[in-house]
Each structure stands twice: as C-alpha cells, then as structure tokens.
Amino acid sequence: MKEKFAALIIMDGLGIAPASDSNSVTLADTTYLDNLLKEYPNSTLVTSGEAVGLPEGQMGNSEVGHLNLGAGRIVWQSLSRINVAIKDGSFFKNQAFLDAVAHAKKHNSKLHIMGLVSDGGVHAQMGHYLALYDFAKQQNILDRTYLHVFTDGRDTPQESGYGFVKTLVDYGFNVATVSGRFYAMDRDNNWDRVQLAFDAMTLGDGPHFNSALDGIESSYKSGIQDEFIKPFIVNDKGLIENDDAVIFANFRPDRAIRIATALSNPSAAKTIYTEGKPMLNVSKAPKNIFLVSMMHYKETVKGPLAFELQTFDDLYGEVIEKNGFKQIRAAETEKYPHVTFFFDGGKEVPLANSTRILAESPKVPTYDLKPEMSAYELTDKVIAALKTGEYQTMILNFANPDMVGHTGNIEATKKAVEVTVECVGKVTDFIINELGGVAIILADHGNAEQMRDQEGKPHTAHTTNLVPVVVTKKGIKLNSGALCDVAPTLLDLLGIEKPKAMTGTSLIEKI
C-alpha cells in the first residue's frame, strides 16, 4: 500500500477505562472519536511496563511514549538502566559520581543530591536516592552531604510527599531545602517560578522551617499540596555554594534543564529558552559547581553524565528523510520536546526535511483554568501548513487530556477531552477529504480516564490502562500491540520498507 499522506495524531493522556463519574473521557462528548471507532479499523495499545522498556507495572509517560513511537522498537528506559546498575553494583563505582566526591574533597566543600522525591518513576525514583545515600556513606562524605527535595504530587497522590521525605529523613538524609515541582521543575519558561527554587537552594531566600516535615505539614495545613509547595529552607549550612558538587537525580531531562543549566553554566541560563521572556537572574549563582546529571539533559548543561545517552539509528524521522519525504512536527509548548527531541531518540538537531510548528501554551498557574490550552491555535497552524500540499507525513500532539488531567479537576479534564476530540476531528477531516491521506489516532499513555483513586481522592498521575488506536483506512484489520509498532505501521501505509533496526511490527494484519 502507498498512501499520499500518513499522519500520527497523539491524544496525550487519553486512556481506556470503564465509564464512571471519575472518567473524564466517558463523561465527555466524544462523538467524533466514537464515530471513527465505529467506521474505521481500531484496536488497543500497551503503553506501560516492559512493552515500553520500563519495569513491569510501571506506568508510561510522554517521554517514554514518544521515544518508543519514534524508534519503532522497545526503548529500554533510564529507570530500568539505573535499577540494573544498582542491582549489579556498578552504580557505586560510577565514575561521574566518584569524580563529584573527588571535587568536593579537593575543595573541602559539600556534596548535594537534588531531584524529584517520589515513587512515580517518571522523572526520578525513591530507590535511587537510597542508593546515592549508600554511595555517599561508602565515600565517607555523609557529614557534608545535603538533599534538596523537589516534591511531586503530579505523578503521585497530592499529599504523598510527606511520606516520601520521611522515608529519606529516617534513612539518614540531611535535607537542606524543599521546593514543589511547580517551581523547581518548570519547563514552560516561567522563570519567576524557577527563580524562587534556585534562590532557595543557593541563597537561602525563602521561608525557614526547623525540619522538612514541618515545612511540608505547614503547607498542607495552608491548603498547598506537594506540587505547589513554595520553596523553603531547612538548613542554611546545606546551601549550594562555590566549589560544591551536585548530583541531579532526575533521569528525565525536560524538567531538569533550567536548574541544571543555572548551576553548571550560569552564562547560558541568560539565553536558554528566553524567547523574549524574563530570564533567570544568575548574578549571584555559585561558581565552580561540579554537576553530575543522571542522564543527558541538554547541551547547555555542563558536567559529566552518570549514564550516557543511548543512540539509535533508523528512527522514523530519519527513514522519512532518507526517502526524500517532508514531515511536520507539531505541538504546543508543553509537548513540543516530545514530538521533536524525544521522538527523534534524544537528538536535538532538526531533520533537514522537517517543519516544526509550535503553539505557545497559555500562561496560567494550572491548566484546569484554561482546559482548551492552545489546541485551537495549534489546529489552525497545522491545517495552514497542510494546505501547502508539501508534506507526506506529520506527528501531531494534543496535550490537553494529560496536562489538564494532572490537575485532578474532572470537569476541566472533560472539557479538555472534548476540545481535543474536536480539534482531532478538524485535522483528520482535512487529511481525509482534502489530502486523500490517512491518520493514525492514538494516545501515548492513560490519565484522563481515571481522575479519582480508590479512596475517592484526586488521581493526578498517569495510568497503566490500554489506549485506543484507530487508522482511517477501510479494508484493513488492526492487531493489538504496543507503541513500538506505530512507526512500522506508518511506514507500511507510506509504502516504505521497515529498517531492520525497527523490531516493532506493523499493526496492519497481513492477509
């Protein structure tokens, strides 16, 4: 088969679950999607666990999802790689970690460990902190090792941070500062938020509490949950200062870039991702910081990597380029790295034949305040590009079900799902009716279909539920599969031979 045009449209965070009063997908008016499922071949995909290179039972996420989608093979994830290193003991002999300790000992300075403290497994993992504590103990530097906590509440229950931090404190960690991820891990150019976290860790600016647990408990009593805990200081002796060493425990890059750049390469923090917006003030940033990133974050982050970046050949975008086809990558800010950097296997340089379309995400504290986000603007930009008739394929992401789903607001997420389905409809109809092309419509993981946990409390994390996949081509049958099977399916539709490196299989059943 050889289609004129084949698109992948990702409804981020829209999974499958039984109808209920906490399922924003089934509560929403999804008539267009329902009709697609009735009219065209469809099936389900696994987006979690070993099918996407994670430990069994571990929920998927957008980074993992887009890596697998673009690679056309199972990509073993950072979480699994680090877990294996801890298990086989190589973690404790890691040269980057050893160099960080050597730097601190040479300068008679401190060793800092920082990152998201939770068992969500999306950006970081509790077990990795315990291993880093054991490492510091082995290296006889515990007396000057400090922990800078970023609380979660997004990939975990909203007030679970207290328990996670208590576990680390009981283990022996000396906590210096605490910041909600809303501040420390912003990725949408909200520099004022990042500034508060950075200044707390480096200058001691912010509220002070006698203990990390006291500060977290105080936030809860004020109605502030983990994600939004305002940066506070526990121990001024543990601030990040000149000549210190830092190990950043986050293994996912997108929300680690800002703080890591500011610490390791302050001059770059003045220009990175500014786009004319207020920048981070690094005039008082500590000097000669030796920063170890758990994984590669971005070129602006200086210092060794604990685990080198995996490299992949013959990714979907590269195969498209080799065949002389032109492609679109489109998303709003929140998911833009996913359709570019992650979909291309961690490669930052745009492919020569690709056009990138970005709609800026709205500047609101939380996306339940604007559940439509920038979906309409993104849709208009995409259709305008498609009207040129220049392209043979497209990767398009609608962020709404996931980003609004993370707020725990059922009604807002219902609206987010409806807007997404509406916009998917506009783009899909144009592809079918104007281009004579085909669209694969799916999700990269679940979220919006489960908005309450078993106790009736807000559920803001991803799920391990199956997700839908539909191909707008009649006369074929779809098998069930995993995200690694999507790139081979796109190539199948375009009449391009799948490279050997792609071990995924086309979802289209061969007759």
Swiss-Prot record:
* Gene that encodes the chain: gpmI
Q: What is this protein called?
A: 2,3-bisphosphoglycerate-independent phosphoglycerate mutase
**What's noted on cofactor binding?**
Binds 2 manganese ions per subunit.
Family indicated by similarity? Belongs to the BPG-independent phosphoglycerate mutase family.
Question: Which organism does this sequence originate in?
Answer: Acholeplasma laidlawii (strain PG-8A)
Q: How does it assemble?
A: Monomer.
* GO biological process assignments: glucose catabolic process; glycolytic process
Give the record's GO CC terms. Answer: cytosol
So, what pathway does this thing act in? Answer: Carbohydrate degradation; glycolysis; pyruvate from D-glyceraldehyde 3-phosphate: step 3/5
List ligand-binding residues for Mn(2+) 1.
Answer: D402, H406, H462
